[in-house]
């Protein structure tokens, strides 16, 4: 079984409490949990330079990503490492649109910026606040095949409930 953490924050934004990122702490975390890969998913921003640095420093696969405030909920959008420049430009559009804690982008803006959602791994806050609205999940349709919960207990509960 592979161990992954696809929700790592490394840069504080307006959506976060202030924190200090430490590469050594990240290395310790990866080693202690024996992770096989991670994704860097800061709130509404992507720091390409920092991502490249972290990728070189870690011995595991690191995916580029962004956690987007989407229609008052949150969604992780994770990319391949193939065209970082294009991903960076798209993420900068999100950053320009979200200037305060109450700002978010619409589904239409998400499509306008990232065009082909099937190129990305999309992970909505499902049973975790701020969760994505059912209407937004329906719009995302087949592009969603997993969700994020806050605990192992909630994950196990979701596995046993057929309507989730």
Language model regions located:
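An N-terminally biased module of ancient metal coordination in phosphate/nucleic-acid-related enzymes
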Residues: 1-72
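Domain-core and long-helix interface of multi-subunit machines
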Residues: 3-21, 49, 88-164
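Glutamate identity and glutamate-enriched acidic tracts
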Residues: 31-34, 52, 57, 67, ...
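Ordered hydrophobic segments in well-structured contexts
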Residues: 37, 75-78, 121-123, 146
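Short, glycine/serine-rich, charged loops/turns that create anion-binding
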Residues: 44, 82, 127
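A basic- and aromatic-enriched beta-loop-alpha substructure that forms the phosphate/nucleotide-
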Residues: 67-100
């Amino acid at each position: 079984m592979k161990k992954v953490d696809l929700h790592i924050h490394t840069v504080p934004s307006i959506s976060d409490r202030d924190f200090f990122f430490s590469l050594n702490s990240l290395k310790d975390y990866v080693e202690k949990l024996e992770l096989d890969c991670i994704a860097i998913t800061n709130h509404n921003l992507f720091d390409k330079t920092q991502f490249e640095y972290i990728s070189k420093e870690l011995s595991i696969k690191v995916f580029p990503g962004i956690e987007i405030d989407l229609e008052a909920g949150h969604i992780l959008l994770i990319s391949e490492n193939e065209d970082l420049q294009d991903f960076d430009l798209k993420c900068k559009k999100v950053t320009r649109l979200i200037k305060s804690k109450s700002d978010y982008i619409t589904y239409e803006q998400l499509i306008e910026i990232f065009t082909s959602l099937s190129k990305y791994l999309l992970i909505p806050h499902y049973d975790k606040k701020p969760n994505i609205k059912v209407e937004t999940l329906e719009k995302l349709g087949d592009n969603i095949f997993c969700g994020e919960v806050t605990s192992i207990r909630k994950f196990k509960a979701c596995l046993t409930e057929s309507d989730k």
